[in-house]
Amino acid sequence: MKNKYIEQFEAKQIEGKNVPDFRAGDTLKLAIRIKEGDKTRIQNFEGICIARRGNGVSETFIVRKMGANNVGVERIFPIYSESLESIAVLRRGRVRRARLFYLRDRRGKAARIKELKK
């Protein structure tokens, strides 16, 4: 059981955030605020969500994309991070797992995920 002050603080952190509903297998486009010196800029990161973990303020998710020379790039983001400007769901994936770590071993067409039909 958490302390009531901690619960109030966490509720305040979550309050203003508008997070879309997404799960493992969905293709996401993230706008990340990057601070370099005294300047800030927005950098996009697009990839497949391979896992979600935790709940509340401490909830995180892992996004994987294939970078240059077919090198996989994975980044872990807290859902309620201040550096996340926006999260957009581009495609809904049809998967039967909550964790898609097997995609780390797949290359090319084998790493594709079917789109969820509406």
UniProtKB/Swiss-Prot annotation:
PROSITE patterns: RIBOSOMAL_L19. InterPro entries: Ribosomal_bL19, Ribosomal_bL19_CS, Ribosomal_bL19_sf, Translation_prot_SH3-like_sf. GO terms for cellular component: cytosolic large ribosomal subunit. GO terms for molecular function: structural constituent of ribosome. GO terms for biological process: translation. The keyword Endoplasmic reticulum does not apply. Keywords: Ribonucleoprotein, Ribosomal protein. Pfam families: Ribosomal_L19. Belongs to the bacterial ribosomal protein bL19 family. This protein is located at the 30S-50S ribosomal subunit interface and may play a role in the structure and function of the aminoacyl-tRNA binding site. NCBIfam families: rplS_bact (TIGR01024). PANTHER family: LARGE RIBOSOMAL SUBUNIT PROTEIN BL19M, RIBOSOMAL PROTEIN L19. This is Large ribosomal subunit protein bL19. The lineage of its organism: Bacteria, Pseudomonadati, Campylobacterota, Epsilonproteobacteria, Campylobacterales.
